[in-house]
């Protein structure tokens, strides 16, 4: 069995290098778009033939993210495997890695991160500050933890959750029974609520040589647990920014494997920094980097998984990213109106993901706006978002 050796000469081989990606959503699409610029071929594994990445990939394997035989096929047809979704089958990927197939980030890292209780336990063991947490074993243990942590407290499904869909804030004791039933018997954990003054994130990349580089600190504003706006640079002190980068790089240094990682953190009023979650892939809060940085998070991910030199990101201008979400009460086909008006605004870039169906609060695209300063970019972004409307067909 021939396993290609990925090196700095990888782009000069006789045929194009092939990256296999588990997941064909918007992240896979944007990885593929950067890959095409470098003459790299992309093979997608996704259950939907009309997934966003299908329009820019060279081949698509139609299968569930956890399908072992499909993952093996992806490995046979690719030079390196990565993933854009935590739902990938980490056990199947561990087997491939043991057979010398290049899989990045490490399946061991994926296995740690895709279970939130396991992830938080790992971080705590590595002396990285996280909220107090514990596993919920029964309604009695939930009541006990709510008493210990105080309310509000955050109940989280440990697996198969994303975009806040696995989170539920418990605000009073009389809501404990319905909160316990909310996840229908799934493995859950309770976290002590952190009264933060800022939510921030940092994209950090590492290659197989151990080189680590960080992007600027981003400030995130959420609405109903889904990212609404990202502001770069974050409106925090220089001291907090330096501390956040050190913590983010320490976090990634404790994990195995190459790639790009998103580290979400809370900043408290006394400027303590607490790690919330890690994403072992490109992240929504890093989309601004396409227009606002010298290297995007997607190109950096490609560099990392191919063990190419990483580029130190430089921020060209303050930037704001806002998501375009599906309407609350609509499932089905849709149109996006207001594009002409939107594109009349200076320094606005529009990204439409090409999803065929809208679902409540589903990410359908995003807008990135740059400005001479943060406040100008925020005002311009708010003006731009008012012009966009997603309507049902």
Protein language model regions, located:
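Short, well-ordered beta-strand elements within core beta-sheets of diverse protein domains
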Residues: 192, 287-290, 367-370
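Active-site "cap" helix and flanking loop/linker of ATP-utilizing ligase/carboxylase catalytic domains
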Residues: 243-263, 269, 279-331
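ATP-binding N-terminal substructure of ATP-dependent carboxylate-amine bond-forming enzymes
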Residues: 1-114, 118, 125, 140
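Internal nucleotide-binding/catalytic subdomain
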Residues: 166-270
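Peripheral (often C-terminal) accessory segments that flank ATP-dependent C-N-forming ligase machineries
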Residues: 7, 15, 303-393
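A conserved helix-loop-beta module that forms one wall/lid of the active-site cleft
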Residues: 107-168, 173
């Amino acid at each position: 069995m021939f396993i290609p050796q990925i090196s700095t000469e990888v782009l000069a081989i006789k045929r194009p290098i092939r990256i296999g990606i588990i997941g064909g959503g918007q992240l896979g699409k944007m990885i593929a778009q950067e890959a095409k610029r470098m003459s790299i071929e992309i093979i997608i594994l996704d259950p939907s033939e009309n997934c966003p990445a299908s329009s820019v990939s060279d081949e698509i394997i139609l299968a569930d993210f956890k399908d072992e035989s499909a993952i093996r096929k992806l490995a046979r047809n690719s030079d390196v495997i990565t993933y854009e979704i935590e739902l990938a089958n980490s056990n199947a990927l561990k087997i491939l890695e043991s057979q010398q197939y290049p899989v990045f980030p490490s399946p061991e890292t994926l296995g740690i991160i895709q279970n939130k209780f396991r992830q938080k336990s790992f971080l705590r063991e590595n002396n990285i500050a996280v909220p107090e947490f514990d596993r919920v074993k029964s309604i009695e243990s939930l009541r006990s933890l709510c008493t210990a942590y105080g309310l509000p407290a955050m109940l989280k499904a440990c697996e198969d959750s994303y975009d806040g869909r696995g989170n539920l804030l418990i605000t009073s004791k009389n809501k404990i029974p319905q909160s316990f039933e909310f996840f229908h018997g799934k493995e859950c954990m309770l976290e002590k609520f952190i009264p933060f003054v800022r939510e921030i994130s940092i994209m950090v990349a590492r290659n197989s040589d151990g080189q680590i580089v960080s992007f600027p600190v981003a400030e995130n504003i959420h609405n109903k647990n889904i990212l609404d706006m990202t502001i770069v640079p974050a409106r925090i002190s220089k001291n907090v920014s330096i501390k956040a980068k050190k913590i983010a790089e320490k976090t990634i240094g404790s994990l195995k494997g190459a790639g790009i990682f998103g580290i979400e953190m809370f900043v408290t009023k006394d400027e303590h920094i607490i790690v919330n979650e890690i994403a072992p892939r490109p992240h929504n809060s890093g989309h601004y980097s396409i227009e606002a940085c010298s290297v995007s998070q997607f190109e950096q991910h490609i560099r990392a998984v191919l063990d190419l030199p990483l580029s130190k990101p430089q921020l060209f201008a303050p930037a704001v990213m806002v998501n375009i979400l599906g309407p609350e009460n609509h499932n089905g086909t849709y149109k996006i109106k207001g594009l002409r008006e939107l594109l009349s605004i200076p320094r606005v870039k529009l990204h439409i993901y090409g999803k065929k169906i809208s679902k409540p609060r589903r990410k359908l695209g995003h807008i990135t706006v740059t400005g001479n300063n943060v406040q100008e970019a925020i005002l311009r972004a708010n003006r731009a978002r008012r012009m966009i409307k997603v309507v049902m067909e």
